Amino acid sequence: MPTVFPDDSVGLVSPQTLHFNEPLELTSGKSLAEYDLVIETYGELNATQSNAVLICHALSGHHHAAGYHSVDERKPGWWDSCIGPGKPIDTRKFFVVALNNLGGCNGSSGPASINPATGKVYGADFPMVTVEDWVHSQARLADRLGIRQWAAVVGGSLGGMQALQWTISYPERVRHCLCIASAPKLSAQNIAFNEVARQATLSDPEFLGGYFQEQGVIPKRGLKLARMVGHITYLSDDAMGAKFGRVLKTEKLNYDLHSVEFQVESYLRYQGEEFSTRFDANTYLLMTKALDYFDPAAAHGDDLVRTLEGVEADFCLMSFTTDWRFSPARSREIVDALIAAKKNVSYLEIDAPQGHDAFLMPIPRYLQAFSGYMNRISV
């Protein structure tokens, strides 16, 4: 825990909760009559409102992207390596906005929050929201903050999908799009992994059809299994081999079916347990479905080039060589479509052994490329 914050940290930060009374029409045909969005901001908005950067989070992310909530906080925000003075998203230059998306479980309206119409927890009654719905809610957030146009919209993985959707839904409101370790839509294999994780959650006897909070229980076992499955896909075989190999946790093999004998088993159980204590099961189902549903080209005859013909932003795409969940080939699909649509695009494939989670890590070549692009953005 820091007693003095590093010079390149944004330091102590406080979340804000913004309430919206205007109904939000959703892709599903349902609507939210009112909702809350929790945000954090770093840096200062300039007089012309031209230096604003939106951070879009991935599946388990939230608004706390940088800095510390208290001097007792053990770890900084989830993208602290990239946000702060002198970092790729330099808060001396940019005004940075990070939020917890609708359907999340970190303060924004979602399954774990109170339904104002009933006075009870939403649970399974919270409507499905999509990437497009998130972008519409983020546009309202921009309006509330007095931001007509983002200097950049930035995100990795599911966050990259939101950044891409911004350029399609609101082309005139985005000058630069940074889409990192992402894809134009999920592959069948990716959807399959998400379905296995959902079934693990749904099969927990304490899930209770999504109304577990009313009964004062948590479907920890199912959520733990779901996270264990997901976490494997975020790491590369090389990274897991280097970190764990076949190292034993015990002194020797016990030759039974129940012992935790390998370090990798212990690690996965720890990750699953930790996740199950802080994340909402209904939110997990919603987030994985939002991933599955994302397919902006579907509305344009599955033609990604035609989908991107109307975008006005300049693009930066980055991928990682050992990411098999969102492989470099998926980023190149977007790059090729942008080139065919005659748009400005930069692309870097970074040699990194960490797999999909590399976009969250302080890899020198990644940070250098990230900084190089952000430094060229005029405000």
From Swiss-Prot:
Which GO BP terms apply?
homoserine metabolic process; methionine biosynthetic process
Where is the site Important for acyl-CoA specificity?
A: R325
Give the function comment from the record.
Answer: Transfers a succinyl group from succinyl-CoA to L-homoserine, forming succinyl-L-homoserine.
Where is the catalytic site?
S157, D323, H356
Q: Which residues form the AB hydrolase-1 domain?
A: 51-360
Its principal location?
Answer: cytoplasm
Q: What is this protein called?
A: Homoserine O-succinyltransferase
Question: What HAMAP family does the record point to?
Answer: MetX_acyltransf
Q: What reaction(s) does this enzyme catalyze?
A: L-homoserine + succinyl-CoA = O-succinyl-L-homoserine + CoA
Q: Does the keyword Transferase apply?
A: yes
Enumerate the residues binding substrate: R227, D357
Supply the EC number(s). 2.3.1.46
Keyword Thylakoid listed? The answer is no
Record InterPro entries: AB_hydrolase_1, AB_hydrolase_fold, HAT_MetX-like
The record's subcellular location field reads: Cytoplasm
In its UniProt record, a GO molecular function of this protein is: homoserine O-succinyltransferase activity
Q: Which UniProt keywords apply?
A: Acyltransferase, Amino-acid biosynthesis, Cytoplasm, Methionine biosynthesis, Transferase
Q: Which species is this UniProt entry from?
A: Pseudomonas aeruginosa (strain LESB58)
